[in-house]
Amino acid sequence: KDIVGLVDGYRESAQSWRELLLDLKRRGLETGPELAVGDGALGFWKALREVYGETREQRCWVHKTANVLNQTPKSLQAKAKGHLQDIWMAETKADAEAAFDYFIEAYGVKYHKAVERLIKDRERLLAFYDIPAEHWKHIRTTNPIESTFATVRLRTVKTKGCLSRKTALAMVFKLILSARRKWRKLDGSNQLAELSHGFKTLVTRRLRYGFQCSYGY
């Protein structure tokens, strides 16, 4: 697991993400990763389809859960969250599909907006099930890099004065390098070579102040 790209860009624009992905391609990642994991940022997915059109998409379940629960009353959110967890914590894809259908049936009539937000990404939410189970917990959310971004946000918020573009980029890069020392080893890492052409995953998120970052394994 390692950082593979960091650029400054304009919010979630497709152009900013395109620059990062093209930089990865220029530096040797000519064939795109098998799977890309991220939230619902339209800019990233648009750029990914243009640069690495064969890469499969996996939506982050943490972000999607929050997005769906926002369309339900607070009194129901704990119960609905449990039913959503039944989907992405299922032991098989068949069980996940069954739990998905149950959520639609249970909430579709009264909370159709919540269900609509879920079903529009159905295939992209369940893509991780086509990968060996040892890797699931690393690729169904963006959690593996969220703690790193929290470190970056904490430091940038406390930084006083106006940073130049180069200074800000250098500071963010050093913070990520420092946080990388605490990254835990991937479960099932010894099986990566057995996957088709050395399975690669790209996990992306936008950092504070418009920095785009990706890491892969």
Show the residue positions of the predicted features.
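Acidic/histidine-rich catalytic cores and adjacent linkers
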Residues: D86-Y217
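A generic short alpha-helical patch detector that favors 3-5-residue windows
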Residues: G9-S13, A36, E57-C60, T72-L76, ...
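Short helix/loop capping segments that flank catalytic or ligand/cofactor-binding pockets
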Residues: W45-K46, N70, A127
